[in-house]
Amino acid sequence: MKLSFIGGGNMAQAMVGGLLAKKSFRADQIFVADPDAKARAKVSRLLKRGGQVSASVRDLRGLGSLVILAVKPQAMEAACREGLADRLRGEAVLSIAAGIRLDSISRWLKGHARLIRCMPNTPALIGAGITGAFARPAVSRAQRNLAQRVLQSVGKVVWLDDEALLDAVTAVSGSGPAYFFWLIEQLEAAGVALGLAPGVARELAIQTALGAAKLAARGKDSPASLRERVTSKGGTTEAALEVFAREALGERFRKAVAAARTRGTELGDILGKDA
């Protein structure tokens, strides 16, 4: 069983590295095509002497059982039309490009139906991501399982029954890391304003976020229960949360996430147009 990556950028490199580290695939089972010499050099270092790395999909010895489209959204149409469309037979095609709908990819691939679309996030670059995925009905169970193996190389995977929900996934987990980075920034700034040294404030904010996430990830208690456990009646945490409530922070946050979802839908309309 072999895989081919069309695009060898950061996310493709993370997946290749994860697959090799977990011994899910050998280097000689992985093919990568990317016109950028620097990207090819990085992938080649990962694969060492195994697999094949080329400048064009036309030069690959084969496509394997799964083709991963790992190019930027703006380059997706060209990647599909130039060399790939004419080589596809029964392979499954997995797109990790944000915003590009499967209707557009199918059109650029001359009606190819075995398509999977997913939305990873940046923590995937360190193997700690989560990916939302949707598979069209023509994708076989074996092909879906193969896609799952690939995506699990960089974190967890959740499958959706409706492609349109990927816009919500993008708003929650795709953009989500930025929300948490912003919150860390604010907590750090608040600590500095209270007299803490910047380095100390940053370390406190980051480790608190990390520890809280680990507690929540255990799944034994809901985030609400964990919050209530920290919040003593008349205490310091309650004083802070009362300010959040007065300022309607929760409602504003939900509006922000909804705005991200709306923009994702708009970008799908824009990016899916033929050049």
Go through each PLM region and give its residues:
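Short pre-catalytic strand/loop immediately N-terminal to key active-site residues, enriched for Gly-Thr
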Residues: 165-171, 223-228
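Internal alpha-helical scaffold of NAD(P)-dependent oxidoreductase catalytic cores
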Residues: 104-114, 130-168, 179-220, 263
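Rossmann-like NAD(P)(H) cofactor-binding subdomain of soluble oxidoreductases
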Residues: 31, 47, 57-133, 137
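NAD(P)+-binding Rossmann beta1-loop-alpha1 motif at the extreme N-terminus of oxidoreductases
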Residues: 1-62, 66, 192-194
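Hydrophobic packing residues within well-ordered alpha-helices of enzyme cores
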Residues: 15, 19, 40-43, 79-83, ...
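Small-residue helix-packing motif on alpha-helices
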Residues: 30, 40, 60, 197-204, ...
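NAD(P)-dependent Rossmann-like dehydrogenase/reductase catalytic/cofactor-binding core
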Residues: 206-275
